[in-house]
Amino acid sequence: MAKAVYVGVGSKARKMKKAYVGIGGKARKVKKMYIGIGGKARLCYSAEADKFGTATPLSKYRIFLAGTTVGGYALFGGGGYDSDARKGEAIMDAYNASLTRTTAASLSVARQGLTAITLGNHALFVGGRSGDTSFGTVDVYDASLTRTTATELSIARCDSAAAVVGSYALFAGGRRNNGLFTMSQSAVDAYNTSLTRTTATPLPSNVYACAGGTVGGYAVFSGGSSMNSDSTLVETIGAMEMVRAYDSSLTSSKAAPLSCPRAVHSAATIGNHLLFAGGYNSTTGKYLSTVESYDASLTRSTAVELSSAKNGLASATVGEYAMFAGGYKGNSDAAYVATVDAYNTALTKTTMPDLSVGRYGLASAVIGDYALFAGGISKIQGPAYKYQDVVDVYSA
């Protein structure tokens, strides 16, 4: 567990976020501090990431939920839990900086496979599906957890990707179910801080299960599956290498492609790097451990690989670490992965203590110094599956 030091400022205790010492005329960052107690060195401060433990479980176990942050809360909304995880839930769980859980106003429409992101003082929960119906619903939560709705997506869909650039939150790709068939989508909807929706240039191909993130002045979307499929997000067909970038004026440009096709991967920004990690390559039929980095000029490089090849992982950036947790790596009792890898601003990888339960289809959100990984599904043994309500907490 990470340790903290507090200093008195204006009669209030303020947490020290960083500490430096002078060495050879240069400021060097302190990673750990110790104090002597009873003749022994005791750790009193750590700037390194670690596992904190678990928080109060979700109010209901579920998979394919969405997580993000607003005000002083980490929010986890929606999800599914029936025999095939297609039926949606409207639950909204909120965790404060003390990791106390409350229940906020429910989503206006019960759904799973939705996408969430924070834009200014609002948390947006967008799209999703329940059964064979897709939704374009946009639920908005403010810092007091009051829920309103914004203009719907231009096309109802689930399994889209999100990223923020400038004053816009972009929602790209996804797939639409209408009860008869499923169609992947290329639409990119942009919402500004006034929650006005505009339509940006579409992606070059119809895709779902792509990944999105922000670096420099760009929102970047990569990969995804081009195949029209109503299958689960375990082994997608038609994965792609495409990478598309949008600047703050919503101008679209092409970036260097991924090194290989991938879908159901995850993205996180750390420092000047946007990382795309894991996924499934339908061309080779292999799960991926590859981590690709895009800098502010959209130059692509590779980082140290994940400790396990997998897709369906969750990601979060907390402190100076981008974390990738959980996932799925094949049809076996050991397919549901518990590993957690953390990358610092130098892209040095640290393997963290495992999740309490290996699982897939989990969601993440950050509150204060904590990254929370919630929900998902695990395989117990043989044909037995278990939907999860566990919330693992990592600190930095």
Question: Language-model features: where?
Answer:
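Kelch-like beta-propeller repeat domains
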Residues: 2-14, 21-22, 35-396
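A short, compositionally biased N-terminal segment around positions ~18-40 that is enriched
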Residues: 23-28
